[in-house]
């Protein structure tokens, strides 16, 4: 009986320890947050277009996701309220001394169809989808993004993720160019997607 009591006590203690410790696979990832500098510009953009936008809490270094920063080479809103925000870093030189990091974020308020672009490779300059050649879906934090590998305009030679939210189309893309290859760009885009913060107009 004494041995049985000790065994029961050990079982109870083990159960108590197990109930108080969550396994790593079940722990909830921290909710991403944009810095105050990042959030200020994205809030202004959301208010300007009267639609939600996605603030990137993470971009590959040295890109910062701050609208108006030294790396923000494009800050554009069209008459239809669609927007393009772009960050680029370029370094000239041979081999590892040179390279480019270029990330775009797009939004098309109240539109879910893929936009059309002029085919610059043909004399007739016909309209073709701006995003094409889908290669599966990536799911992160409630977003189901389709991966496109043939893209036009500012997204040419980029891998692009596009998804829909509340009746609007959104996209992120990154240029496949040294110092990053296709596999590394996919890793970066997955992390960017995972770190997006939805900003509603105020």
Question: What name fits each language-model region?
Answer:
Residues 29-34, 40-42, 46-49, 188-202:
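N-terminal leader/targeting segments and the immediate start of mature chains
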Residues 32-166:
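Short, solvent-exposed recognition patches
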Residues 18-26:
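Bacterial lipoprotein signal-peptidase II cleavage site
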Residues 1-7:
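Bacterial N-terminal signal peptides that target proteins for export
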Residues 21-22, 93, 109-111, 169, ...:
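Residues that cap or initiate secondary-structure elements
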């Amino acid at each position: 009986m004494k041995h049985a009591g000790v065994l029961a006590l050990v079982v109870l203690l083990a159960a108590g320890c197990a109930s108080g410790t969550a396994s790593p696979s079940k722990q909830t990832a921290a909710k991403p947050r944009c810095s105050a500098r990042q959030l200020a510009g994205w809030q202004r953009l959301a208010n300007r277009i009267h639609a939600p936008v996605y603030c990137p809490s993470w971009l590959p270094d040295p890109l910062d996701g701050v609208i108006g920063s030294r790396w923000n080479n494009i800050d554009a809103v069209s008459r239809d309220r669609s927007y393009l925000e772009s960050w680029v870093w370029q370094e000239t030189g041979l081999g590892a001394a040179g390279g480019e990091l270029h990330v775009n974020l797009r939004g098309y308020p109240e539109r879910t169809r893929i936009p059309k672009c002029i085919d610059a490779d043909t004399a007739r300059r016909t309209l073709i989808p701006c995003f094409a050649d889908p290669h599966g879906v990536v799911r992160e934090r409630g977003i189901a993004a389709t991966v496109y590998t043939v893209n036009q305009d500012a997204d040419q030679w980029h891998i692009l993720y596009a998804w829909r939210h509340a009746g609007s189309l959104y996209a992120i893309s990154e240029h496949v160019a040294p110092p990053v290859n296709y596999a590394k760009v996919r890793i970066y885009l997955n992390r960017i997607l995972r770190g997006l913060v939805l900003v509603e107009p105020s």
